Amino acid sequence: MTDPSLFSAKPQTSTVWWKVACLFTAVGLIWRIGRYLFDFPIWGDEIMVALNFPDKSYTELLGHLDHCQVAPPLWLWAEKFLYETAGPSSLALRFIPLIAGCLALVLHAWFAWTLMPGRAAAMAIALLAVAIWPVSMSTLTKPYSTDLLVALAMLLPAHAALTHTRPVWAMALLAIISPVALLASFPAMFIAGSTLLVLLPAAWKSAPSTRWTYLALVGTTAIGAWASIQIGQNQLASPTGTAEIDTQQGMVDYWSHGFPPADPLRWIPWFLGALTGQIMAYPVGAANGGSTLTVLMAILGVVTWMRSGSKSVLALLLLPLVLNFMAALVHRYPFGASCRLAQFLAPSVCLLAGLGLDACLSRTSRWPAVLVSLVLLAVGGGGLARDWMWPYRDPVFVWMRGTMDDAVQAAGNDSVVVNHRRESMECVFAWRWLHAPAKVGWNGSLPQGERSHDRVWVFTQEGCPMPPGPTALEFLKSQDPRWRETRFLNFQYPPPNPQKQPPIHVEMVLLERD
């Protein structure tokens, strides 16, 4: 079952490129760890999944999720465990994504160096190390960096099974990894399917032990896929609070640009736009053709690989993209909608684009390669410097964090009445009040079990639904007419572009009894 790598031996100059590869790996790790330590303000998409941790048990996380969220069960369990043991801080919630992102970069470096000649491997490592999407996903409380790690954890033994003279052990390892991977990453389904398809022809021509091991791999993968699909379907069936819309419909609507248009005549423009958009943003790129250069490098890499490398390994790298496209055709998983949804494709994109970039560089002069390396280093160093100077995703989340810091500090250990349900208000505000030292009541009610008060704060977000009936002040005055408003705190966010984002107004009123 031996299937040779792209080159069986590396030239002497690989010593230099090994050092370059190590340098890029170090830069990528430093950027990821630095961005994590800069502690960007937590934002809505992170909190919407985190809001499932306080009230749901580990078993309940296998069922419906609130706030239109979908996430693999093992990732949810790991995050809930950290939430319970390390607390609700953003650094605690982002720790697992950071570890996954750093490990993924190291595994990618190992994989690239195993597959390709020195300079091509260094280019492939650099593309992943300094790309903004893998870096940002490593510091986000979402499972995307885990998708990347799981993809590499499956590709490495799959490659070993294709290239080693005794593939049984690599295939057996893959049989153990596969069901775990499918429960840790939903897109791992594409990697698992590609692996089974690529290994089938060679396994069936091998010794009986290899065939039986392959059948075991099929069995464990089927079990993991079945469990993953069942849990995913439970989550997709979750109600969203909007009549006749569940999470699945919400996801389809939100990621509609990741599915082919109804008119077949528009399929080719849609496909080309998706393929040259964010899905290929390594090291940089954008939607609407913004990653065309990376696509061209990847195509050149495919051509180069077909001339010199293993066709089976090339199929292993390309099939996940094909399966992703097929899933988009039946509206099961978006294609090209966002780079964060396609982190499982990052190894394939970076390896092929790195090989294509290497093919473009001169074989006689070192200066073009040096210049490209310096540009890529500047991308990584510039990204780290930008994160240091502007440590936030969007200014509104800086304002939200500052507003809630002031509000929570003002409330102290007093009682707080939040005039809204948790699910109807800005989730950043809900998260902070949920973990504030103050005693908090929701939907206009006094904190449960707290009926003896002298000071009560009332928190209101303008534009959010409020409960019918008397206000907190009216209720308290009905119990004791000495209650009155004594202090007002107003927080206003004027957005830079009011047409895209409405202003946010929050009010805190202190009620005291004379």
Residues of each region from the PLM?
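Membrane-interfacial, low-structure loops and terminal tails that flank and connect transmembrane helices
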Residues: 1-15
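Membrane-proximal helix-loop-helix interfaces that form the catalytic/acceptor-binding platform
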Residues: 13, 17-513
